[in-house]
Amino acid sequence: MYIVNLILPLIGSIITGIFGHKLGNRISIKIAVGCMMLTAISSLYIGYEILLCNSVVHFKLGTWMQVGSLNVEYGLLYDSLTSIMIIVITCISSMVHLYSMDYMKEDPHKTRFFSYLSLFTFFMMLLVTADNFVQLFFGWEGVGIMSYLLINFWYTRLQANKSALKAVILNRFGDFGLFFGILLVFLVFKSVDFSVIFTIAPFITEYTINLLGYEVNAITLIGSFIVIGVVGKSAQLGLHMWLPDAMEGPTPVSALLHAATMVTAGVFLVLRTSPLLSYSITILNILTIIGALTTLFATTIGIVQNDIKRVIAYSTCSQLGYMIFACGLLNYNASIYHLTTHAFFKALLFLSAGSVIHGLNDEQDMRKMGGLVNLMPLTYQCMLIGTLALTGFPFLSGYYSKDIILETSYATYYWEGTFAAIIGYVAAFGTTFYSFRLLILTFFNKPRMQYKTIAGVHEASTNMVIPLVILALCSIFIGYVTKDFFVGLGTPVWNNSFFAYPYNNLILESEVLQRELKLLPLFAFIYGVITPVLFYFNIKEDRMINVKQNLMVKESYFFFVKKWYFDFLSRVLIVVPFFHLSYDVMNKNLDKGLWEKIGVTGVATTLVTAFTALKLKNEITLSTYISYIVQTIILIIVVGIFSFMTGFIYMELCIIIGILYICLPSIKID
């Protein structure tokens, strides 16, 4: 069951990708969707065995590589964390597969699309089921490659090419960090297996590594590189620029990769390595600060976006910040709780946005929409449910998971927790503001489309509606149903998954917070709804003119539109200097400059010039050529003996090239 659960997406990908043109589009796509549905069902069964029966399944499949003391084996680890992740991955992926059957119906390359989706699911499952760092890194790189291929699926579009390259290059920085973190793990622990590393970790908390003459705590140094990987993959502040641009791919790709699964790989990495990272207060503080700042940054940028998919993308970035700073405060169960609920309502939002885009002939600018509430009522209801769940409307899934993060953050009573909680409350208001702004601009007011566009607006087809309805039901009920399971006091589910200090029982502390603090998210929701209604519902110029003329509003708006100048600063301080270094210095002056002059080209040119001059001075006769040939043979023998004795081959080749160039009578001098 466990191995079948892992390889079914791979089988679907191979059949669709390799044999799709022989089987036909319809049959091959049905095979891919069927494999994904079976994978989701098997994941639910595995979840029953692991989660409800409170067991762990760990088995080895054989040796992968053995070099010296490095022994890497194929192994699968199914604990509570893995079970939750594979349920989320396979359920969302199966819904996206079903949705894409109609969404990509007119695309001539749809079999390739389904093959990519299934292969991505396989790599994601390989990542979360790995029992060692090397296997995890293999899955980590696999999802990065598939992200590039799926963003660039419409490869004839220049913007898709740029976005895919931007995503893969920025993720290289994160992959570089994780790679060096794995090297340090092997250096310190002499193993890459999680079981060995986590067993030894409590005994080396004081172990140090000499780095450039300074003694650095080993766990802190390893954690620093792991954090770089987390920041890259989960689009945290500093390496976040790729996520909004990744919206150039098809909308189902955005729902699967950039909302529910791939971007949560960084959060999963923190949770998986929690028995190691929990011993470094420095790393935990860094995670808290980065997550909180990412939440604030993404919220402020989302307020001023006009592309419907980019608004949801920045919302994803913001919610990932919540998960990361919850991990930094050792509140791991709340983090995985929010990850699970977020996956369902964010996939719902993206797929609902896809239905809107599909119905409006690929229009994504919210300023060119409006009045769709009567034309697409079912899509509106699904979008409304997803929006309410995201903003923390009482008794929907986001209400439980996000509130528990905010309450437990404040309940730490350390400055890091207070800092994260304050930013979280502010971001809760901002999230509600831009979510209802999206809802109002898209579905209310007068239609702002052309008449022919309005005439062609239609509700989504059955295959697109079914996933929306299922995800909407999950967005309503899954938070309430699983609350005690994830964050209930005394729940045994996480005993074998991640580690936190025993005294760090934040659930009890959050239950005795002041009433005002518990009501803050509700007030943030109320004000977040009222504000966009006042400004955007039945827009009137006299209502907006004073706001638009306010200098502070103008400057803030410009600052947010420029994305805090991150793109500008990264281009000026990193991209342009590295471009000049690589092109002007390394390429023009060294590779095609100095090295060519003193290297093969320069030596060959010098010899050609010298022998050409000699050739012009002498009379070209048969005896001259015979003399050159004899001299060449003697020179080759001498140089060969010299090369054999010294091992110096480079100059020998240069001399032979030059001499043969002169000796061949076919050479003509113009």
Curated annotation (Swiss-Prot):
It comes from the Eukaryota. GO terms for cellular component: mitochondrial inner membrane; respiratory chain complex I. This is NADH-ubiquinone oxidoreductase chain 5. It catalyses: a ubiquinone + NADH + 5 H(+)(in) = a ubiquinol + NAD(+) + 4 H(+)(out). GO terms for molecular function: NADH dehydrogenase (ubiquinone) activity. InterPro entries: NADH_DH_su5_C, NADHpl_OxRdtase_5_subgr, ND/Mrp_TM, NU5C-like, Proton_antipo_N. It is found in: Mitochondrion inner membrane. Its EC number is 7.1.1.2. NCBIfam families: NDH_I_L, PRK06590.1. Keywords: Electron transport, Membrane, Mitochondrion, Mitochondrion inner membrane, NAD, Respiratory chain, Translocase, Transmembrane, Transmembrane helix, Transport, Ubiquinone. The chain crosses the membrane at residues 1-21, 31-51, 81-101, 111-131, 133-153, 178-198, 211-231, 251-271, 283-303, 311-331, 339-359, 375-395, 421-441, 462-482, 519-539, 566-586, 594-614, 629-649, 650-670. Belongs to the complex I subunit 5 family. One of its GO terms (biological process) is ATP synthesis coupled electron transport. It comes from Dictyostelium discoideum (Social amoeba). It is a multi-pass membrane protein. Core subunit of the mitochondrial membrane respiratory chain NADH dehydrogenase (Complex I) that is believed to belong to the minimal assembly required for catalysis. Complex I functions in the transfer of electrons from NADH to the respiratory chain. The immediate electron acceptor for the enzyme is believed to be ubiquinone. It is an enzyme of class 7 (translocase).
